[in-house]
Amino acid sequence: VVPHVVTSAHGDRQDEYYWLRDDDAKAKRPEIMAYLRAENAYADAMLAHTGALQDTLVREMRARIKEDDSSVPVYDNGFWYSTRFDLGAEYPVHLRQRGSVEGPDAAAPLEVMLDEPALAKDKPFYDLGGWAVSPDNQWLAWTEDTVGRRINTLRIKNLVTGEVLPTEIPGVLERIVWAADSATLFYIRQDPQTLQSGPVYRHVRGTAPAQDVLVYDEPDKTLFTTVGRTASREYIAIWLTGFTTTELRVVPAQAPQQAPRVALARRADVRSYADHLAGRWIIRTNDDARNFRLMQATDAALADPARWTELVAYRQDATLEDFALFNQALVLQERVEANAQLRVLPWNGQGGFTVQADETAFVMSLGANLDPALPRARYGYDSMVTPHTVYDVDLATGARSVRKTQPVLGYDRSLYDSARLWAPSRDGKRIPVSIMWRKDAFKRDGTAPLYLLGYGAYGYAYDPYLNANALSLLDRGFAFAIAHVRGGSELGEGWYDDGKLEHKQNTFNDFVDATRYLKAERWAGKVFASGGSAGGLLMGAIANQAGMEYAGISLWVPFVDVVTTMLDETIPLTANEWTQWGDPREKAAYERMIAYSPYDNIERKPYPPMLVHSGLWDSQVQYFEPAKYVARLRARKTDANPLLMHMDLESGHGGKSGRFERLRDKAREFAFFLDLAGIAN
């Protein structure tokens, strides 16, 4: 304990564990490393009796993975692209094969573009950020992170000769895009301190990075900058995106030297997203349409919203989440009553249809539809009991074809069941809850253990999916559920708005209310809660506000020191997220945030058993947030329940990068919960 005062215009706070913070991106002070290693050793000792169970769980989870697996090929500009996992490999190989929109050319060789296992060799962490192939199909640019801090390096490869150019550009974001000349590459440099988006640059292949030209530098650091291309391939798109506003600037792909022009100007509280094809812009906007509507405009009219015409009207009962443009049709992704579904609208106005679903609770999501000449749209389908399935739907007939159902080895769907429940909230709302169980192992008698996930932030819809790892819990009598709490967008933009800023407490109340409903309706006797990042904030809040409702809580890379972080603009994400949580420089926002910030509300009272997971190189939620949280909680709580922290010293926000390596962390959590539930195997 070292006294330290965190100052603000609205009051000072003691932070006796502030000494655990070290902003050095390459190494931490010896006393901090000693502390973190001691925490890891303590957690290992406390869980040593579950070692055999953890090993069993890892074997079970790995046995469900088809080790020699391939993705469904995706078409773009004369090639079909895919990934392949070889037996035992942690990382995939990226492949391509020549072909047409009808399919790959069987006579053409399968080319290796990127060999991730080779790139990751001898590295404790490897993450392929993004990649882009030049329009002439000869050059590959990609970004990679070898630390886990989401600091990427840009590299370029000649796909004809296999030569990797010596040029490397460090400190860039993942997204990159080529101009039409196949020589000019647009990328975004990271702010060296916050690691967030900085200025857009263009690089000419074969020249030194020092000669790269500044294209655009956004002064408003609450906006996030990304680059892309339009479906027509006529424009390089520079997007400036915040939680409440957007702006689009474009550069002609044929004239990359031109300065970007404003195509969609930012407007307060208006979010618009546009794409271009066949001489017109299609715009998804919430202007006068809370759940979004679709507009269209010519090139000349795009900058003036008064000249737009409506293409798809606003619906109060449906949220327009996304769209994809094809030469012959427009495909919409809409959400109705928590289900995401697709609707196809031919440009000729004839034969529109909604894509068929086979279950009552499901999610469809637009896939990688990269070439508008395709006669079929690619989409994914998921539910609590259905493995991820890739479909193509014929844009003319509506006929669906299954391209691949993700193998879950040993999974027998007939043994499991699922339901969509609606839990009443304390303020009269209906909270969707997706639940799954094994029919011959689970008993709905009010005694069963239940594994409950939640998130509730950023408008992210935590959709139902088959959690293959959780089958190890279900086979031992657990139920598995997701509480779709406010702050997500499962029930539209209003559901999102009612779980942020001054309404953030609704997120926590919803999770607790869903928990109590599941107990009252005899779905659960003991509830074990888990959430990560902003979902870790949710876990920290419920631990303070209703902790003893839970038999155990697991927090993954948790955002728990809300006010201190949001006061510090040097920390990644802070300025970008003031419109999400509030700006604590303002008194009203400060008081709201301090009222729920988990670190600031730890009390001298009993807490449930808790397990905290973090990564030393996490740039999204810095390692010292969970480290301080655990230290203060251990000092103040009055019970003898276990409080454990595992700090991965070689990873960041996403945990281990290898597909098998990360199973060990999940096995630790499951063994912790199974042990608390009294289930040894």
Pin down the residues of each PLM region.
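Active-site-proximal cap/loop segments of hydrolase catalytic domains
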Residues: 482-681
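Conserved beta-strand segments of alpha/beta enzyme cores
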Residues: 112, 214, 479, 642-644
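Secondary-structure transition/capping motifs at alpha-helix termini
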Residues: 102-105, 147-149, 159-163, 179-182, ...
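Cap/lid segment of the alpha/beta-hydrolase catalytic domain
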Residues: 113-134, 143-151, 160-165, 351, ...
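Residue-level signal for short, function-critical loop segments
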Residues: 287, 329, 457, 533, ...
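Beta-propeller folds
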Residues: 1-388, 392-397, 467, 649-650
